[in-house]
Amino acid sequence: MSEDRHLIETPLSRTELLRGNFLHVVRDTVLMPNGAEATREYVLHPGAVMIIGLLDDGRVVLERQFRHPMQTVMIEFPAGKLDEGEDSLACAQRELLEETGYSAREWAFAGRLAPTVAYSDETIDIWFARSLTLGERQLDDGEFLDVFTATPAELRAWCFGGEVIDSKTLIGSMWLQNVQAGEWALQWKDAAASPLAGQSAP
């Protein structure tokens, strides 16, 4: 927006610092609004999805997974990174099935979050899924996680008490609370009547 011109930095050049199996790190030289130059180091990311799976009994699908950088087991909503050329919903459908064994008949896009704006361009699309059917998980090699269910009230209590500190799951809990309270509306689509794979998030 034009009123933000006094805040915006202009990219001048880029140096690649690391291209690993998981991380792609670059250093940009930028022109700041005051005319001085500065460097910005950050992670390039293809994007990711998070799935809030709603069971017919009102419970939600969650995972417990060890996160090496944190050196602890985290409670999280199912989530995963976009494959090259993959659209958001197809990724959500794939990740839900692979990690939890659930497939969903109805899907709704909720919104998008940027979890680490200071050092990554990653965004996470938030998807709700309902009318779930449980099948067999298809975990990747080297992927270890437990799937469990909880009530929304239990999840909120864990967020308040500090048992849940994963940022995307905290945001997901906020979305869940507002959707169930009728404050935020979702547009549900029936995957059985009209396959959604191939559609992207708005």
What are these regions (language model features)?
Residues V25-R27, T39, E63, F77, ...:
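Hydrophobic residues on conserved beta-strands that form the core of alpha/beta folds
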Residues L12-M50, D56:
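Acidic, metal-coordinating catalytic segment for phosphate/diphosphate chemistry
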Residues A38, G47-M50, K81-S167, L186-P202:
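Unchanged
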Residues N34, L55-D57, F66, A129-L134, ...:
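Short loop segments at secondary-structure junctions
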Residues G172-D190, S194:
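Charged phosphate-binding loop/patch that engages nucleotide di/tri-phosphates or the phosphate backbone
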Residues P46-T72, E76-F77:
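A glycine-rich, hydrophobic loop/mini-helix early in the fold
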Residues M1-R19, D190, P195-Q199:
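Extreme N-terminal tail/first-helix region
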